[in-house]
Structure formats: structure tokens, C-alpha cells
Amino acid sequence: MSLLANRRFLKMHGAGNAIVVLDLRGTAVRVTPAEARAIAADVHSRFDQLMVVHDPVTPGTDAFMRIYNTDGSESGACGNGTRCVGYALLDDPAMARPAENGALTLETKAGLVAVKRITERSFTVDMGQPRLRWDEIPLAEPFLDTRRIELQVGPIDDPILHSPAAVSMGNPHAIFFVERDPDSYDLGRIGPLLEAHPIFPERANISIAEVTGRDTIKLRVWERGAGLTLACGTAACATVVAASRLRMIGRAARVALPGGELSIEWRADDHVLMTGPVYLEGEGTFSPDLFAGIDG
């Protein structure tokens, strides 16, 4: 029987991004890819990202997070999910532990992130520094300037999309800037083709962005390992960084996604801050039947 059977979880969302939070602190239990896929497939626990909270690894941090996509793969970062974990660790009766000034330091395989409460339902996450070198993103070929890389969709002489920016926020992103509504593009068809393009050795999140004002952006995202999503916090961060590097905006913007709005600031110290809402939908426990045939 899976060791996840009968364990409690929280069902949450941040700007429409469906999040499941699972607390495994105090145990040696680890989620397998097959278990993550089973959780994602169940109507009661369906998620865009599964945020699994483990005991801290690095002294001075509050917890270690493992982040799973719906296909069972792991991600190094999830901004919306991190806000939800922040809420759970500060407010959920079964998970909360004292934190100074409503602030937490969390660790993922990509590094440290700081979470701070702004209001009852709003949190800011310090997503750290963007990675802009081709080998840090990573890309399969050396590009001296990742503000635009050579990649296009459609005919050579009349491409549908071309020359995306490439940025890593702990996970790789390609952002296509366009001059019409991102909703007018068939991202559900384009996204999976580009996600697995050979230029991205670790696959990539694919975004289509329209700069609608000096500090406003409209964004659609195909999320690596998850598909079309209502919101992606790291994509919003990567898009603001990319747009700022291209001098389309300043260093801060409100990013409108189908599920809601996120406020992003790329500070002078190179750290990217993301502020947005969290919502608790409910809680549940995993049925043993959910993991039938899976060894935990």
C-alpha cells in the first residue's frame, strides 16, 4: 500500500493555479512520479502543481519543498504554489508553526525562496535572481544574447511566432512577445511542440505575452509538465524580466493571466518579487484506492 494513503492534503489555488499542499514533515516518505500522476488524475485532488513539504535541509530555513507537475516530473520553482505553502505554514491549524513577522524561508532543489504575508490572503515571494546565461537556463546551443533566441513557429518567411526571450526562474521559460491578444494564438497546439523542442534540453515553459502598457502585460502560459494553465507565477516573473531587458517596460508590472493578476518587481539587487493572492478551497485525505497497484 502507498504510504500516502489516508494522508491529509489541502486544496488551494493562487490566481487560478490549482495547488495541492501535502505535509510530509517528520516522515521519510517521498512521493513517487506514479503517485503524483494518480493524485493529479483524481477529481478530488486534481492539481497543476503538487507542493510537498518536507523537513528543512539547510539550517535557518523553515521547510524543504518538492514540486511535482501533473505528469509526475519535478520542477525547481512554482511561485503560486509557494504562496500557498506560505499560507499553509502560517495559518493552517495542522501545519502552522511560529514564524517571525509572518515570514518564512523555504528551500527547493533550485535554491531558497522567501515568503512574506502582505494581507490575510496576499503573499509576496522573493523568487531570487533570474538566470540569463544560455547554459544556466539551459539551452542546447550557445546564445550570447538570450533576450532573443532563434526559434520560430510557422513558415520561415511568415512565422506565427518567432524570436522568444529565454529566462530561468529556477525552471526554463521561453516568452514570445506579440502585438495582438495572446488568446488569439492556439497555445494548446503550439505549447507542447515547443516545450519539447531540442533547443530546451530540460523542456521549457512556453508563454505568449502582449505588453499592453508601460506597466501592464497580458500573458498566456503552456506550463512544462502540466499544459495550459490559468496562471504561472514563474512565467509572470520571467516575462517581466524579459520585457524589462528589451526595454518594453520598466522593472515592475502587473501581469494579467486568465486566473487573475500578479504584481512582479525586478529589484535593483536583481531579485524578483511576486505578489499575489491565495485561496483555500478545502481539505481531504487520499483514498487508499487512489494508489491501487502503486508501491509506495
From Swiss-Prot:
Signal peptide: none annotated. Catalyzes the stereoinversion of LL-2,6-diaminopimelate (L,L-DAP) to meso-diaminopimelate (meso-DAP), a precursor of L-lysine and an essential component of the bacterial peptidoglycan. It comes from Methylorubrum extorquens (strain PA1). It catalyses: (2S,6S)-2,6-diaminopimelate = meso-2,6-diaminopimelate. The active site is at 78 (proton donor), 232 (proton acceptor). This is Diaminopimelate epimerase. The lineage of its organism: Bacteria, Pseudomonadati, Pseudomonadota, Alphaproteobacteria, Hyphomicrobiales. It holds the Pfam family DAP_epimerase. The gene is dapF. The record marks 173, 223 as: Could be important to modulate the pK values of the two catalytic cysteine residues. GO terms for biological process: lysine biosynthetic process via diaminopimelate. Its EC number is 5.1.1.7. Belongs to the diaminopimelate epimerase family. Keywords: Amino-acid biosynthesis, Cytoplasm, Isomerase, Lysine biosynthesis. The keyword Cytoplasm applies. Homodimer. Substrate binds at residues 17, 49, 69, 79-80, 171, 205, 223-224, 233-234.
